[in-house]
Amino acid sequence: MTLHVDRTDRAVSVSAHGVEILCYVHRSGADPFEGPKPYLHPVRTLAGDMVTAYRPHDHRWHKGLQMTASHLSGENFWGGGSYVRDQGYVDLPNVGTMRDEELTAQVTGDRLTITERLTWHTQAGEHWVDELRTMAVCDVDAEDGSWALEFGTSLRNVRGEPLEFGSPTTHGRPMAGYSGLFWRGPRAFTDGEVIAADGQGGPEMMGRPARWLAYVGRHDEVDRSATLLFFDDPGYASGWFVRNTPFAAVNPSLAFDKEVTLPHGETLDVRYRIVVADAAWDRDRLERYAETHPW
């Protein structure tokens, strides 16, 4: 068996070939202002190099890789201040919580599947969303130096009226359409390389759609690099939020520049794949991986 799993009452740790490659903290105990929610940190390559940041001083609510909703019908399931048109970021009493209700973890062969039920509650205590989240750690390839995380979520509106998913961009801040599954990279990854499908790349990918997008960064302390290859939901593709300065961040946005309405009782289903690889993969290697691992 390639994968080894350790569990506590608040986290699931996954190791491959003797290296802890991720820890999923499903009961975080975070400060309410940081928008308590589950997160993945640390996330590491098979060589043991860290590829996530946790509570950086500029954004304490950034925690590794996590599901978020920056603007949801006036509520903030992101953390910190909310962007208000013509005012900028304002600290409001609207920071919600994603609560873990039940979690199972099962290894079958060389694949670990985590299934979790969550409920989303506003700061005022209203129950708005029932979520079914499924994650899989798979395709661990020691020779290739890579492994993959598949992340799927079903968000069911139980509010009693429609929910509007938005972002700072839908509320007036240009090129800041973050919402949904969000990765914050280590400080050392600042000024990394952004490569995307179909010959695209660079910081100009902000707001553009692409089947996949990769971020290549260099580690401090060791003479190594790492690549994170993100596959967007093939049926969704709102546009990428991506920055390589002043920090490394990637997010296949739920609502980059257009709000998404989820009627009461209906479900929004999205799925993503993130490949964590040792070394700096070039475009040819990224395209080969995408071709041989269709999503």
Show the residue positions of the predicted features.
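Beta-strand elements of well-folded, non-transmembrane domains
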Residues: A47, L118-A124, M135-D139, L155-R159, ...
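Active-site/ligand-binding surface loops and adjacent short beta/alpha elements
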Residues: G160-D233
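Beta-strand-rich N-terminal accessory domains
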Residues: M1-G64, G152, P162, G166, ...
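Acidic (Asp/Glu-rich), glycine- and aromatic
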Residues: Y24-R27, P32-P42, A142-G192
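Beta-strand-rich recognition/accessory modules
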Residues: T227-W295
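Extended, loop-rich substrate-binding clefts of extracytoplasmic carbohydrate-active enzymes
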Residues: Q66-G145
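Extracellular/lumen-exposed scaffold segments
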Residues: F33-V84, I195-A210
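Hydrophobic residues positioned within well-ordered beta-strands of beta-sheet architectures
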Residues: I114-E116, E131-R133, L149-F151, L181, ...
